[in-house]
Amino acid sequence: MKKTIFITGASSGIGKATSLFFVQQGWNVIATMRSPENEKELSGSPDILLLKADVNDTSSVLDAMTTGIARFGQIDVLLNNAGYGQQGIFEAVTLEKIRQQFEVNVFGLMETTRAILPHFRKRKTGTIINITSGAGRVTVPLVSIYAASKFAVEGFSEALSYELESQHIKVKIIEPGYISTPFYDRAKADYAFDPQLEDYSKFQLEMNDLFSSFGAMDTASPQDVAETIFEAATDDTHQLRYVIGPDLLPMINLRNSSSDQDYIDAMRGQFMPEAFGKSMQQKN
């Protein structure tokens, strides 16, 4: 029997690329999104079932899973991909925006995971793949809320992997670096700004200039991520984390090879070189 993957947030970027790649590899795909009626590229294959599901509406997720199982017989892999990135100085991000970030990136992911577990337990097999981010391992300024949500998913996923081992269910974490997708367009559109916080103006300009240069770096593509997701789904190992992106690997390697304080000092020197240099001189 052909295997089946259930994907959230399949309308663009990593979700869409993964849907197309898995079909090319001979899988069935249940591609879910909030507005499937607007999707054209994924609608032509008999092996792709387009369904409406919003991770913040558990009943819609359960309905999509039930419909998908009726169509394809079973679900073998859940890909929790739906999410977005709230950016901006922490003081400028309202509590409403913070809650919404966690509703989508954390609570929606958790409830989607909860929804699939009875099916996986009944079958005594299944793989849950959670898309986190480099920001869940090594974070930077202006993404404190997004990073907090991804750190939460990292901790949840690791702890869950230990729990579900007893049920023969695997948990995998995909950690992309910078990927050029509509994800970043939304992040820019949702950027939290408060003109009254003038004290941060110079810092924000410098950081935005720095982050704008990331697009010119050697980075991974949605296709690269899709291929790594396929590896995680099929490699039959207990590997938990899969890091993607030449921009991210050096930062993770630095964190792993340095003491905690040496790493923090290096990052502070990167983001606030003048102020950090003065503070280090005063210490010495």
Predicted regions and their residues:
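A glycine-rich helix->loop->beta "capping" turn
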Residues: 67-80, 86
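Substrate-binding pocket helix/loop in short-chain dehydrogenase/reductase
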Residues: 89-90, 97-99
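C-terminal beta-strand-loop-alpha-helix "lid" module of Rossmann-like NAD(P)-dependent dehydrogenases
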Residues: 169-214
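Conserved glycine-rich cofactor-binding loop
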Residues: 11-12
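Active-site helix of classical SDR
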Residues: 113, 149
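The beta1-alpha1 cofactor-binding region of Rossmann-like NAD(H)/NADP(H)-dependent oxidoreductases
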Residues: 53-63, 95
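Residue(s) in the substrate-gating loop at a strand-loop-helix junction
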Residues: 133
